[in-house]
Amino acid sequence: ADKKLYSIRDVVGTVESLPLITSSILSKKIASGVTSLVLDVKVGNGSFNSTIQIAEKLAKSLVNVAKGADLKCEALITDMNQVLGKSAGHSLEVIECIEYLTTTKRDKRLEIITNDLASSLLMMINNISKEEALKKINSVLDNGLAAEKFEKMVHALGGSNSFLSSYEKQLAGNSYSEEIFLNESGWIKE
C-alpha cells in the first residue's frame, strides 16, 4: 500500500510533503503497536532532507504527531553526507553489521550513531542514564545476545535460521568490493 501511495505522491508532486511523509512513516509504526520509538532522521546528500532545516522540521513533525498518538517518541538527526560505516551497498553493509555484532571490529562513526540511537531508546523505556544504557548495549554485544536477536529477526523475515554462520555464502555474488590504494594521504570530499 505504501508503494502505491508513494507513486501517487510522485505523480501529483507531493513526494516532499512533510505531513504526508510523517503519516507514511508513523502510520506503520503506530499500527504495529509500538509504545516507544526513536527515529533516525537523515540529512545530507544521501537523504531526502538536503538541509538541516528540512530535517529539523520533519523530526519535529514526527515527534509531535507521535506524541499526539500517545507514542513516546524522539528523533535524532544524523548526517548522510558520507556512509555510516566503512561500506556502501546493501550486502556490504549487512556484512559490516554482522561484523559489528559478532566481533569488536566496529567503525567509530557507526558505533557512535548506533550507541546514540540504542541508548536513546533504552533511556526512554527503562528510565535509565546514558551511562547505564551504554553498559547494557556493550553487554549484549559482548555476550552475543545482540547477534542472536539479529539472527532471529532475519529468520522471522524469511531468512536462514543460521544466517550468522552462513552469511558469506548467502551474500556471495550480491556484492562487489574493490580496495583502492592511494599514493598519498588525504580525504575524499564532495
Region spans (language model):
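Divalent-metal coordination cores built from histidine and acidic residues
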Residues: 1-7
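Well-ordered secondary-structure scaffolds
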Residues: 4, 12-24, 28-190
